[in-house]
Amino acid sequence: MAYPFQLGFQDATSPIMEELLHFHDHTLMIVFLISSLVLYIISLMLTTKLTHTSTMDAQEVETIWTILPAIILILIALPSLRILYMMDEINNPSLTVKTMGHQWYWSYEYTDYEDLNFDSYMIPTQELKPGELRLLEVDNRVVLPMEMTIRMLISSEDVLHSWAVPSLGLKTDAIPGRLNQTTLMATRPGLYYGQCSEICGSNHSFMPIVLELVPLTYFEKWSASML
């Protein structure tokens, strides 16, 4: 989860988020090198007295500044496309959960079970217990098994929403009349918080998401108690 005054990303809890962090570092290094080169050239232009006012063309320079940016863009695009394909790939999910956005709460349905569904509302500030997080706690958490491929089917009953859990690298739009899907797999147990990431009305800020990732045996006990 996020911490006060945090500048970086949340800790990665899924293979997708780990890949996104590596891609961010890769891209940031390219941006740093380009920025350093530009600042170096600007400093040279400001400090040197040599000018080339009579130069009409320089084919070598033009070739370099055409080919070099193309190579840089390829170095950025290839890993980006790889991650995009990884995010769209869903192979033999062990569990499917249908998520519906409402103004202003989420509803969940475990489609592999006959009657396992519930609504998830934010707990008001005045009802929080000591140690609970303001604007992030819900009355019904989404309990899921860890280290298993889970397919999330996401849609909306009214307006545009967006189901997002940063530490898992997830952000999928909930669109009325359309069913989007994404996959998640957590590498360790814990509570993972998210929020609606699409402005959806006056209470947009009060649509938290809480995932509770547990070992499979605990999930089986929980699902049996809910039926």
Curated annotation (Swiss-Prot):
Keywords: Copper, Electron transport, Magnesium, Membrane, Metal-binding, Mitochondrion, Mitochondrion inner membrane, Phosphoprotein, Respiratory chain, Translocase, Transmembrane, Transmembrane helix, Transport
Matching Pfam families: COX2, COX2_TM
Reactions this protein catalyses: 4 Fe(II)-[cytochrome c] + O2 + 8 H(+)(in) = 4 Fe(III)-[cytochrome c] + 2 H2O + 4 H(+)(out)
Phosphotyrosine, modified sites: 218
GO biological process: ATP synthesis coupled electron transport
Cell compartments where the protein resides: Mitochondrion inner membrane
Comment on bound cofactor: Binds a dinuclear copper A center per subunit.
Segments on the Mitochondrial matrix face: 46-59
CDD domains xref list: CcO_II_C
Mitochondrial intermembrane side: 1-14, 88-227
Main subcellular localisation: mitochondrion
This protein's GO CC annotations: mitochondrial inner membrane; respiratory chain complex IV
Positions that bind Cu cation A2: 196, 198, 200, 204
Binding-site residues, Mg(2+): 198
Top enzyme class: translocase
Molecular function as annotated in GO: copper ion binding; cytochrome-c oxidase activity
Chain ranges passing through the membrane: 15-45, 60-87
Binding site for Cu cation A1: 161, 196, 200, 207
EC number(s) given by UniProt: 7.1.1.9
Cofactor: Cu cation
Membrane-related topology note: Multi-pass membrane protein
Assembly: Component of the cytochrome c oxidase (complex IV, CIV), a multisubunit enzyme composed of 14 subunits. The complex is composed of a catalytic core of 3 subunits MT-CO1, MT-CO2 and MT-CO3, encoded in the mitochondrial DNA, and 11 supernumerary subunits COX4I, COX5A, COX5B, COX6A, COX6B, COX6C, COX7A, COX7B, COX7C, COX8 and NDUFA4, which are encoded in the nuclear genome.
Function: Component of the cytochrome c oxidase, the last enzyme in the mitochondrial electron transport chain which drives oxidative phosphorylation. The respiratory chain contains 3 multisubunit complexes succinate dehydrogenase (complex II, CII), ubiquinol-cytochrome c oxidoreductase (cytochrome b-c1 complex, complex III, CIII) and cytochrome c oxidase (complex IV, CIV), that cooperate to transfer electrons derived from NADH and succinate to molecular oxygen, creating an electrochemical gradient over the inner membrane that drives transmembrane transport and the ATP synthase.
Family membership: Belongs to the cytochrome c oxidase subunit 2 family.
Record protein name field: Cytochrome c oxidase subunit 2
Protein's organism: Felis catus
